[in-house]
Amino acid sequence: MSTKRKRMFSKELKHMMYGFGDVREPLHESIDLLEELVFEFIQEMTLKAAQVSNKRGKFQTEDLVFLVRKDPKKYYRVIELLRMNEELKKAKKAFDETNVEEEENV
């Protein structure tokens, strides 16, 4: 591993590791290694997406979709997460509108 960084995803990775069959309390070294791999992956994808977006001048979600298009598992997961994000936005907007109407009626 390279330089020491603040752990950002340790808790989440620990739960994911357990969910995928690891022990409830995995070794700190295992979590650190996995976190380093995740961090490097995110860093690499962000750099590549920035390079793709430089051609247009603005970073967009589609740049990440473009990068994972040849990996079906990642591609369909990204598409699913984007759809869920849109559904959550719509639900939140509808909820906020309902609350505004209720406050006006009070």
Swiss-Prot record:
Task performed by this protein: TFIID beta-specific TAFII.
Domain (Histone-fold) ranges: 8-51
Family: Belongs to the TAF13 family.
Protein name per the record: Transcription initiation factor TFIID subunit 13
GO annotations of cellular component type: nucleus; transcription factor TFIID complex
Listed GO biological process terms: transcription by RNA polymerase II; transcription initiation at RNA polymerase II promoter
SUPFAM superfamilies: Histone-fold
The keyword Phosphoprotein belongs to this UniProt entry's keyword annotation: no
InterPro entries referenced in this protein's UniProt entry, alphabetically: Histone-fold (IPR009072), TFIID_TAF13 (IPR003195)
MF (Gene Ontology): protein heterodimerization activity
Gene: taf13
Residue ranges of coiled coil: 77-106
